[in-house]
Amino acid sequence: EASLRFPNAGVRFVRADVERDRLGGRFNAILLYSVFPHFRYPVDTIARLVTDNLYCGGRLLIAHSQSREQLNEMHKRISDKVFARDLLPVAEQVAQFTEIGLSVASFDETDEYYYILLQRVGRKLSASVADAIY
């Protein structure tokens, strides 16, 4: 629907299972809105998207328009219907990303939102990122 509403926006909309499917091509930006808790392999998935699908300098945004506490509580109520894992405190999640060599440009969480902005800074995979995803 979005691609029909904005046909000349210079944006390519892709709907995919980013854990299972390989995305074709590279992008300047990837937005993962309200999906991160549903990843079974969150660090591996993000590492693969950053290294395989972002141009150098490209950014990947993990975004939620609710707090971590609200999201975790909601997912507990519907755990029999959909897979979701608890969101970690944003600083802990960022530490997992930086531990394997990913570059985090900014991050924050409040009682209204949760986000992490990653950026691809190099052309080559670091050994730790490669080990995490391959």
Q: What are these model-predicted stretches?
A:
Residues H38-V50:
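A short, conserved alpha-helix within the catalytic core of class I
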Residues S65-A84:
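Short, glycine-/aromatic-enriched active-site segment of Class I SAM-dependent methyltransferases
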Residues L31-L32:
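A conserved beta-strand element that flanks and buttresses the S-adenosyl-L-methionine
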Residues E1-R20:
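Class I SAM-dependent methyltransferase SAM/SAH-binding core
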Residues E99-Y134:
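Core SAM-dependent methyltransferase catalytic element
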Residues V35:
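Hydrophobic adenine-recognition pocket in adenosine-nucleotide-binding enzymes
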Residues A84-G101, F107:
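Short alpha-helix
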Residues G57-S65:
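Conserved beta-strand signature within the Rossmann-like core of class I S-adenosyl-L-methionine
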